[in-house]
Regions:
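Catalytic-core signature of thiol
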Residues: 1-234
């Protein structure tokens, strides 16, 4: 697909970003945490979804999030419909008439529908530079290492519509900001992070794209995930 075709899949503003993050949800890496050189969880990802022109990127990220963790926990694939997640999120996000929603509201939807135990799992968030956190990449790596895949929002650029031939978002100079977009972070290495997007299986490498540390640090807004969602998996 062309750059213009992928641009049609992006709905500006479809990811809502809170002005402040609740202190009760704030998450930081442990002081003694040293990230492994590589941690990749793509083996538990279901095939890439295609959100089309629907402003549901956060709900698709939440569905992919649950699919990944439940496959790890229960040992089988289960594809989850993002529509009910989006619909419930819109009842609690405070702006029912606007397109898009917050990451944390879609996680609340997963708890509402019983995918994870709400008595055990709690929603946590990690702010990026937008919230004054200059160590966000390490915090995100710690969350992936400790709790599994992580939902994240980026202020994407038009480079996302056509990554490099190797499927990499490098953070090109002069790339034009497009607005917020939600994805799933499914791994990392020393040079960047692996993303599962919701723009179909033809995007980048079968729906997955790699973002360099440079681009991550420039574009990352915030992340959200559940603690202890995998409790009992062993």
């Amino acid at each position: 697909m062309s750059k213009a075709d992928y641009k049609k899949k992006f709905v500006p503003g479809a990811l809502m970003v809170p002005k402040t993050l609740k202190k009760s949800m704030a998450f930081k890496a442990a002081q003694n945490f040293e990230a492994p050189k590589e941690l990749i969880l793509t083996g538990y990802c279901t095939p890439a979804d295609d959100q089309g022109d629907k402003p549901w990127c956060a709900a698709y990220a939440a569905a992919n999030y649950a699919e990944n963790l439940l496959w790890r926990k229960r040992g089988y694939k289960k594809e989850i419909d993002p529509a009910p997640l989006y619909q419930y999120a819109k009842t609690i996000d405070g702006d029912p008439d606007a397109d898009g929603t917050y990451l944390e509201c879609t996680l609340q939807a997963l708890l509402k529908y019983g995918y994870f135990d709400s008595k055990v799992s709690k929603v946590k968030t990690i702010g990026g530079g937008l919230f004054g956190n200059l160590n966000a990449a390490n915090d995100v790596k710690y969350a992936i290492h400790k709790y599994g895949v992580v939902m994240a929002g980026f202020n994407i650029t038009d480079e996302w519509y056509k990554p490099s031939a190797k499927g990499v978002i490098v953070g090109k100079e002069g790339a034009k900001p497009q607005g917020g977009h939600a994805i799933l972070l499914v791994g990392f290495d020393e040079n960047g992070f692996i993303i599962q997007n919701s723009w179909g299986g033809d995007y980048a490498h079968e729906g997955f794209v790699y973002i360099t540390n440079k681009a991550f640090n420039e574009q990352f807004m915030y992340a959200a995930f559940l603690t202890r969602a995998l409790d009992g998996m062993y």
